[in-house]
Amino acid sequence: MAIYAIGDVQGCYAELRRLLELIRFDPAKDRLLFTGDLVNRGPQSLETLRFIRGLGPAAATVLGNHDLHLLAVACGVSRVKHKDTFGDVLEAADRDELLAWLRTRPLVHREGSYCLVHAGIPPAWNAETAMARAGEVETVLAAGDITGFCRQMYGDKPDLWSDDLAGWDRLRFITNALTRMRYCDRTGRLDFRQKGAPGRQPASLVPWFDVPDRVPPGATIVFGHWSTLGYFAGKDCYCLDTGCLWGGELTALKLDGTLERYAVPSLHGGYQKPTLAK
């Protein structure tokens, strides 16, 4: 049995199938872990969702910000943006089944010594705390009507964790930290304006995994979301978003002692022009 973590697919279904051929994926004995953002911006969101859902227990995924955006559009809270490419999902005959499956995916997934999350774990939390906080959001998403949550999840505040946070502010921080975070200041305050590669940000900001006095996560964090960072192997974290959508690669990491990396190039040189507005 082999376990592979795979970076942001974002509807790049053809590349996903090529990657699975490369690693010789066998759903009868292997397992896939996806870092979220299964949909949007790429050409085949519907095929991607159907395929991954159809893998059953052979696959697990966490929710990414694009997945949440799809849910918000589907329930009428948000509008389709000009770069969105998930109209095929919204018009599909099995739309309701796919969306019901998607909204019951976790924000954090633990697999042995690995912790899978879309954007990262904020500096004030370890993996166990992240699982508990994620559970608060997951309970709301699984409860039925998610209109209220989708309406309230947008916004950049609060940007600093406190155990005293309550209500929508608390849920918004949890969601933002786990699905949108890249940079923090040295106190752990989240910054959502800077989206480029490390080295281009203001001196007051550092990647979330480099914040001084960051709480040890107690697990190896596997994340995506940050395509301008690309493949990154830190002391206790790995970034697997290698920008397939923008003409880069789709990456898989074998979660064993070797941590062998596999990648396939984007087809057609990418599906959209690179942007820092992901």
Curated annotation (Swiss-Prot):
Membrane-crossing residue ranges in chain numbering: none
Record-linked CDD domains: MPP_ApaH
InterPro entries named in the record: ApaH (IPR004617), Calcineurin-like_PHP_ApaH (IPR004843), Metallo-depent_PP-like (IPR029052)
EC code(s) of this entry: 3.6.1.41
Gene Ontology MF: a single term: bis(5'-nucleosyl)-tetraphosphatase (symmetrical) activity
Top-rank EC class of the record's enzyme: hydrolase
Catalytic reaction(s) noted: P(1),P(4)-bis(5'-adenosyl) tetraphosphate + H2O = 2 ADP + 2 H(+)
UniProt keyword terms in alphabetical order: Hydrolase
Pfam families assigned: Metallophos
Similarity-based family: Belongs to the Ap4A hydrolase family.
Role, per record: Hydrolyzes diadenosine 5',5'''-P1,P4-tetraphosphate to yield ADP.
Stated name of the protein: Bis(5'-nucleosyl)-tetraphosphatase, symmetrical
Gene name of the encoded protein: apaH
